[in-house]
Amino acid sequence: MTYTTRQIGAKNTLDYKLFIEKDGKPVSPFHDIPLYADEDKQIFNMVVEIPRWTNAKLEITKEENLNPIIQDTKKGKLRYVRNCFPHHGYIHNYGAFPQTWEDPNVVHPETKAVGDNDPVDVLEIGETIGYTGQVKQVKVLGIMALLDEGETDWKVIAIDVNDPLAPKLHDIEDVEKYFPGQLRATNEWFRIYKIPDGKPENQFAFSGEAKNKKYALDIIRETHESWKQLIHGQVSDSKGISLTNTTLTDTPTYSAAAASEVPSASPQPDAPVDKSVDKWFFISGSA
């Protein structure tokens, strides 16, 4: 199954939107792309939002029809993650699992916090840098539970099935064996990355421990079930999420016409980024 992208506007601008297409027709990366690429083999589809070593805070938007990828804003300004020494930008290919939802109406029994109202985040640790809008097939290795401003924010650790090391990685202990330092750096990065913006250090459930593959698969299944309730209109409050889709004919928000309402591609050259985004921040107590 091949997916392509349709870009509108220039990166690093408020006008930028990136729609995902299947067979040339826009689909929702939140709802239309299947979670499983191969359920029997436990291979998942992951939508890449932010390529490794980049700074722009790109995300699947929840409020717009067909959920294009846009750059997040705060007070009308584009958001960029800071460079926290010794890291540059995001340290993984960062993205999300389609057809998952961290329900903000439900408190998780172990984290004691509600879901963050987003699809489940994925940290892809393979050697190849992805691109925004790429649909990767990944195998799950483990999971961390970030507690982000009082909400549970799961971070699944996964690897592209085409990575040379993928055949050797089967569970979370293999990450430390073949990627020594990766889990420690991941924990550090998520703890400190908001500090340069004046926010406190993030906290983790489970004392920052990465849970194993079985635990991760259970969380993915739970959030997939939550998404099913969401897309079928079975939750009392959908929190403003656009549920419009172009393939799920048994859902109340199915709309074949929605694809034709997406503007034609109008890509523009990337807009320049302010030099301040390159600054390195040195965080006391890190590393």
From Swiss-Prot:
<dbReference type="InterPro" id="IPR008162">
    <property type="entry name" value="Pyrophosphatase"/>
</dbReference>
<feature type="binding site">
    <location>
        <position position="121"/>
    </location>
    <ligand>
        <name>Mg(2+) 2</name>
    </ligand>
</feature>
<keyword id="KW-0479">Metal-binding</keyword>
<keyword id="KW-0460">Magnesium</keyword>
<dbReference type="Pfam" id="PF00719">
    <property type="entry name" value="Pyrophosphatase"/>
</dbReference>
<dbReference type="GO" id="GO:0005737">
    <property type="term" value="C:cytoplasm"/>
</dbReference>
<dbReference type="GO" id="GO:0004427">
    <property type="term" value="F:inorganic diphosphate phosphatase activity"/>
</dbReference>
<feature type="binding site">
    <location>
        <position position="79"/>
    </location>
    <ligand>
        <name>diphosphate</name>
    </ligand>
</feature>
<dbReference type="GO" id="GO:0006796">
    <property type="term" value="P:phosphate-containing compound metabolic process"/>
</dbReference>
<keyword id="KW-0378">Hydrolase</keyword>
<keyword id="KW-0963">Cytoplasm</keyword>
<feature type="binding site">
    <location>
        <position position="153"/>
    </location>
    <ligand>
        <name>Mg(2+) 1</name>
    </ligand>
</feature>
<comment type="similarity">
    <text>Belongs to the PPase family.</text>
</comment>
<protein>
    <recommendedName>
        <fullName>Inorganic pyrophosphatase</fullName>
        <ecNumber>3.6.1.1</ecNumber>
    </recommendedName>
</protein>
<feature type="binding site">
    <location>
        <position position="116"/>
    </location>
    <ligand>
        <name>Mg(2+) 1</name>
    </ligand>
</feature>
<feature type="binding site">
    <location>
        <position position="121"/>
    </location>
    <ligand>
        <name>Mg(2+) 1</name>
    </ligand>
</feature>
<dbReference type="GO" id="GO:0000287">
    <property type="term" value="F:magnesium ion binding"/>
</dbReference>
<dbReference type="InterPro" id="IPR036649">
    <property type="entry name" value="Pyrophosphatase_sf"/>
</dbReference>
